Amino acid sequence: KAIKAIKDEFDFILIDNAPALDFFTTNSIAASDYIITPVREDGFSRKGLKEILDVVNEIKDEHDLDHVKFLGTFMTQVNPRTTMVKERTLDYQKNIPDLLFHTYIRNDTKVAQMESKFVPMLEHSLESNALFDYCHLLMEMEILPDQVAQKLRCSIGEA
């Protein structure tokens, strides 16, 4: 109900949940139009993703939420130099080819520093690999404002 009251005032409302299948997650799904979930490169995340997809479908059926769509998943806390990330990416591409975003979020110590200070990434370090990756993810989702996307492209020499 709270989100319905403000929904028209925003282009996007992001709801970030703890990795749990609980009351808060259920309410977040019910309040959403689209669901995006991060996964790590470990086996637990693969199993958890399947559980999330099952729960989303159950909640949609129970509460008649046909409008809710699972938009996709992206890998986070990635060390691109490991063979595990390559194997896991191939696994996801094989099993959920239309649901895996190409952009992944690199493991970055600046994220832990930011979290320990309760400071948003944009205020902590503009040189964060994770911040750069999240911006790329938003560009891939086509939800990053044009002026921000243009600045990002200029900063990496794509403009």
Label each residue range with its predicted role.
Residues 61-159:
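C-terminal lobe/tail of nucleotide-utilizing enzymes
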Residues 1-8, 114-116:
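P-loop/Walker-type NTP enzyme "switch/lid" segment
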Residues 2-3, 17, 137, 141:
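Generic hydrophobic alpha-helical segments
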Residues 4-102:
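Conserved catalytic-core segment of NTP-binding enzymes
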